[in-house]
Swiss-Prot record:
Protein name, as recorded: 4-hydroxybenzoate octaprenyltransferase
Catalytic activity: all-trans-octaprenyl diphosphate + 4-hydroxybenzoate = 4-hydroxy-3-(all-trans-octaprenyl)benzoate + diphosphate
Catalytic EC class: transferase
Organism superkingdom: Bacteria
Family the entry assigns: Belongs to the UbiA prenyltransferase family.
Transmembrane segments annotated in the record for this chain: 18-38, 42-62, 93-113, 136-156, 161-181, 209-229, 233-253, 264-284
């Protein structure tokens, strides 16, 4: 394999842009910390950190495969490996399968409940990229896909799925819809021209308001989570910090400028991080 081909595969997996991996990792860590009520099992932690990297990479590959015929018409994505011809569709499918199989082999070291849940995770990762052709709610499907690691991680750590798992699942799904709508605002004009659907298009001039409402609901549910577990001040400080970051994001997107909407999207990494730190300290 040539250096150029390896570089193309690396870019296809978005290894040069880790934001998606981080946004998937933080809620996974939330689940592990809460399920363990502190420090999770090291084997489980290692499996899920590696699994997040592999599955996010697999998701990027299948996403670019699904979008290979439209990415060439979008300024931001024209130079991706598939539309630029540096990777073929067949090579992308093979890479997706290799990443998916590698992830499943990791899951096989977990308990039966986690293994059973993994099948739904694979389905969600596969179907999400195609949803933008059929519905204005692909961000909802991303929310489901990016939240599925939560019940899996919880099951791996505690071997059970109490109802609060799905509450945390809902928190993350709402947050994901909010930040992926910010991301969709970057490409909205191009998406309208080529017929791709998104919540940014669906929400229209109400986009900032709806993002704000989703963020507010996320914060309210986080406070309830803290009350349920009787968490200390460190967690509420982290929720307050997340709220401040949401306010900053609203400031960034106020004029709907592409670059600033993208910066708002990237800023969500800090939201996930401060909440993970708050949970860790609270359960310590």
């Amino acid at each position: 394999m040539s250096v150029e081909k390896a570089k193309a595969y690396w870019q296809l997996m978005r290894m040069d842009r880790p934001i998606g991996t981080l946004l998937l990792l933080w809620p996974t860590l939330w689940a592990l910390i809460i399920a363990a009520e502190g420090t999770p099992d090291w084997h489980v932690l290692l499996v899920f950190v590696l699994g997040v990297v592999l599955m996010r990479s697999a998701g990027c590959v299948i996403n670019d495969f699904a979008d290979r015929k439209v990415d060439g018409h979008v300024k931001r994505t024209q130079q991706r490996p598939l539309p630029s011809g540096r990777v073929t569709a067949k090579e992308a499918v093979i890479l997706f399968l290799l990443l998916g199989i590698s992830s499943f082999l990791l899951v096989l070291t977990m308990n039966p409940l986690t293994i059973q849940l993994s099948f739904a995770g694979i389905v969600l990762a596969f179907i999400y990229p195609f949803m933008k052709r059929y519905t204005h709610l692909p961000q909802l499907f991303l929310g489901l896909a990016f939240s599925w690691a939560i019940p899996m991680a919880w099951a791996a750590q505690a071997n059970e799925l109490p109802w609060v798992v799905w509450f945390v699942f809902a928190i993350n799904a709402l947050w994901t819809i909010a930040y992926d709508t910010q991301y969709a605002m970057v490409d909205r004009d191009d998406d309208i021209q080529i017929g791709v659907k998104s919540t940014a298009i669906l929400f229209g001039r109400h986009d900032k308001l709806i993002i704000g409402l989703l963020q507010l609901l996320t914060l309210v549910m986080l406070v309830w989570l803290g009350l349920h577990y009787q968490l200390g001040q460190s967690f509420y400080w982290s929720v307050l910090a997340a709220g401040a970051l949401f306010v900053y994001q609203q400031h960034l997107i106020r004029h709907r400028q592409r670059e600033l909407c993208f910066q708002a999207f990237l800023n969500n990494n800090y939201v996930g991080m401060v909440l993970a730190l708050g949970l860790f300290v609270a359960f310590w």
